[in-house]
């Protein structure tokens, strides 16, 4: 009962049809990659190492892409092969998700709860509250 209520609150907050509780952020990213049928995934150079681990566990090809001064992935450096981009909002700095509209986007909102429009322009949102 509590899980169903929690899922409804989170899905509404992030503008999504569904929400699911999983054990941790690494599992959430793994599941998101499987749901999106991702094959080639870009992630920023500056991010939690568990994001790369989730990519490797999911069997996708990770592309580690340079960040700009704002610590967000540099869209101009994303290789053509990439079909999915994982975007963490590092230190609560909101990334420009709209600029990634030609990719499937997994938005990591673990560090930015409370910012406007979270989940509005991404395919999947993940939130982790622990290590």
What are these regions (language model features)?
Residues 1-27, 46:
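Conserved N-terminal alpha-helix of the aminotransferase class I/II PLP-enzyme fold
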Residues 7, 66, 108:
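Acidic active-site catalytic centers that drive phospho-/nucleotidyl reactions
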Residues 32-79:
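Conserved PLP-anchoring active-site segment centered on the Schiff-base-forming lysine
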Residues 28-30, 49-52, 93-96, 113-114:
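Short, well-ordered alpha-helical microsegments
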């Amino acid at each position: 009962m509590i899980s169903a209520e929690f899922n409804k609150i989170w899905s509404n907050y992030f503008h999504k049809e569904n929400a699911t509780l999983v054990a941790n952020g690494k599992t959430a990213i793994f599941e998101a990659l499987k749901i999106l049928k991702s094959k080639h995934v870009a992630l920023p150079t500056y991010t939690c190492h568990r994001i790369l681990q989730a990519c490797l566990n999911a069997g996708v090809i990770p592309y580690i892409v340079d960040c700009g001064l704002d610590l967000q992935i540099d869209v101009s450096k994303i290789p053509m092969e990439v079909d999915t981009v994982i975007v963490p909002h590092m230190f609560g700095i909101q990334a420009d998700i709209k600029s990634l509209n030609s990719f499937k986007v997994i938005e990591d909102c673990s560090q930015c709860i409370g910012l406007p429009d979270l989940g509005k322009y991404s395919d999947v949102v993940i939130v982790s509250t622990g290590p």
